[in-house]
């Protein structure tokens, strides 16, 4: 007989022991804590992601605004009021976010794409009034209707988002101040970085053109906050697509040419590049063409004269630079044995002449589009391809290679002011190292003689090159000085590396290259005595670490240059791009 089973339970099932139950409770509690932490972490991460995205987009929009103003005003006038007004706009948006939330029929995030998508059309329409607005009020008013509303609403949106930021771990005074201060710093970082990056890719595709960047920004804002209010941007989008000649498309270019042809001008080609908006335009009535970069001219030449085809420079300063060949030496130097370094190409007037004379000529030009257009539209002559590079680093490499030259031509200019880095003592000393002992340098300087800058630049040049003579492109015109409020002109400074008199031999017929313009302008005429620049006891020079000495006067110089450019070409040429 089988034994009887014991009716007493030997113990509770393993899954229901008190120890097991307690363990499960602890696990549930831990999981609940983890879920709360994960949610909080994800929530805070999203807050800061939105903040960074809004600030980054505003930084890019700020850079795009400046890029769109530079063809109409130049980069320097465009920037005069830019940062100050942006500070005011961001402060208004940051401080007034609650008011905007109450009065707007939509959220600030929904308003952002409406503003952004309207910007290209507003810039175009207001740009047609720049002759009347001038170079100071013009940028301020245009950005006042475009970038600054975007900045106000962006700052308000950031303030709204950061209301959900958990700053309880910080002291109260830090938590109160940090969001605004850090947001402004991040915006400025985004603005500076975006401008630097955009200049490297500008013009490479439609997305990276001036108007293209703004259209893409508007699309991103719309994706972030889609709403029924986007219909308010449809008229502006249609204008940008059909009527805005600033858009870099074949249709817009054809429309622009139709407008220009009615005024006896034609656009041969245009491109956006790292130094600015570059184009070649031709006067059908007067028979000359010029290369434009933003709101300045890099040079020009006659192509039709009295019904016959010609190729003559129209600006005397570039012909004057060729006179560096005429400076007398102890031992005459045949052109076939000479070599030259030309810094800054423009349309290539001076290097083409050197090559025509048989001089071995090296050209360094930073902008590949300028080089391409000089080849394509201005009969650029070469005996070797130009070096497309930054002049500072390129000449430093030449010094390391112990290269030397008989002639150096320094011919650089940017939108109403000298490029400071190329007039510093350190850069000029590098050119001195590249110049042979009996070599000669010609430096083209464009600036306002009513400002201290020309004196400072000349003292710096004299620190390196002991013997110099200075010539204006044209005599001082008191009527123009009164009209424009400045004495802005080109001057060419001819210098020797070693002490000795700077004298010019009389040009021969072959020096003129069968050019009537060279016959009239090759030999410099309007000399300025160096005492004009050295009459006071000031001895300071322009060093690499002290460029602020010059930049503080750039605004006045650029304003004078803007007025002159508006008298050289009609305002509609500048405004239409």
Locate the predicted segments by residue.
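Soluble catalytic regions of membrane-associated enzymes that act on cell-envelope
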Residues: 264-462, 466, 474-481
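Transmembrane alpha-helical segments of multi-pass membrane proteins
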Residues: 108-122, 143-150, 169-187, 233-241
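A positional/structural detector of protein chain ends, strongest at the extreme C-terminus
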Residues: 1-5, 574-577
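Soluble small-group transferase modules, centered on the S-adenosyl donor enzyme superfamily
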Residues: 18-58, 62-85, 167-177, 190-302, ...
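Transmembrane alpha-helices and membrane-interface helical segments
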Residues: 94, 152-157, 211-219
């Amino acid at each position: 007989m089988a034994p009887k089973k014991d009716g007493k339970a030997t113990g509770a099932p393993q899954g229901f022991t008190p120890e097991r139950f307690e363990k499960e409770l602890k696990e549930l509690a831990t999981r609940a804590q983890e879920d709360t932490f994960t949610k909080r972490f994800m929530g805070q991460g999203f807050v800061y992601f939105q903040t960074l995205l809004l600030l980054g987009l505003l930084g890019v929009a700020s850079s795009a605004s400046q890029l769109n103003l530079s063809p109409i005003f130049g980069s320097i006038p465009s920037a005069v009021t830019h940062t100050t007004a942006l500070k005011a706009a961001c402060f208004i948006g940051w401080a007034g976010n609650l008011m905007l939330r109450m009065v707007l029929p939509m959220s600030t995030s929904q308003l952002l794409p409406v503003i952004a998508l309207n910007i290209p059309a507003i810039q175009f329409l207001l740009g047609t009034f720049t002759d009347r607005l001038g170079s100071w009020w013009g940028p301020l008013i245009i950005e006042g209707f475009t970038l600054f509303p975007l900045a106000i609403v962006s700052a308000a949106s950031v303030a709204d988002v950061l209301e959900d930021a958990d700053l309880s771990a910080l002291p109260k005074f830090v938590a109160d101040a940090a969001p605004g201060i850090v947001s402004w710093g991040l915006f400025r970082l985004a603005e500076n970085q975006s401008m630097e990056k955009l200049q490297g890719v500008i013009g490479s595709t439609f997305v990276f053109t001036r108007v293209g960047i703004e259209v893409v920004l508007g699309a991103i804002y719309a994706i972030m906050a889609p709403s029924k209010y986007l219909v308010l941007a449809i008229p502006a989008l249609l204008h940008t697509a059909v009527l805005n000649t600033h858009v870099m498309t074949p249709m817009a270019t054809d429309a622009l040419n139709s407008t220009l042809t009615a005024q006896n001008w034609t656009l041969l080609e245009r491109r956006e590049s790292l130094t600015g908006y570059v184009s070649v335009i031709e006067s059908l009535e007067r028979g000359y063409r010029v290369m434009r970069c933003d709101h300045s001219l890099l040079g020009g030449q006659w192509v039709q004269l009295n019904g016959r085809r010609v190729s003559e420079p129209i600006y005397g300063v570039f012909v004057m630079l060729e006179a560096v060949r005429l400076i007398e030496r102890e031992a005459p130097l045949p052109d076939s044995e000479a070599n030259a370094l030309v810094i800054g190409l423009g349309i290539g007037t001076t290097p083409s002449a050197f090559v025509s004379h048989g001089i071995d000529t090296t050209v360094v030009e930073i902008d590949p589009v300028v080089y391409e257009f000089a080849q394509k539209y201005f009969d650029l002559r070469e005996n070797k391809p130009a070096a497309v590079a930054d002049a500072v680093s390129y000449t430093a490499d030449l010094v390391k290679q112990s290269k030397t030259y008989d002639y150096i031509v320094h011919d650089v200019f940017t939108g109403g002011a000298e490029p400071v880095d190329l007039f510093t003592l350190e850069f000029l000393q590098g050119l001195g190292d590249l110049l042979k002992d009996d070599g000669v340098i010609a430096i083209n300087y464009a600036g306002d003689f009513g400002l201290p800058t020309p004196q400072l630049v000349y003292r710096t040049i004299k620190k390196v090159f002991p013997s110099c003579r200075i010539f204006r492109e044209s005599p001082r015109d008191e009527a123009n000085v009164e009209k424009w409020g400045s004495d802005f002109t080109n001057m060419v400074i001819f210098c020797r590396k070693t002490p000795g008199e700077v004298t010019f031999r009389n040009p021969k017929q072959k020096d003129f290259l069968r050019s009537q313009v060279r016959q009239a302008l090759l030999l410099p005429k309007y000399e300025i005595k160096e005492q004009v620049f050295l009459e006071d006891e000031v001895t300071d020079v322009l060093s690499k670490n002290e460029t602020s000495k010059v930049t503080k006067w750039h605004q006045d110089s650029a304003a004078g240059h803007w007025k002159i450019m508006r008298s050289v070409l009609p305002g509609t040429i500048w405004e239409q791009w």
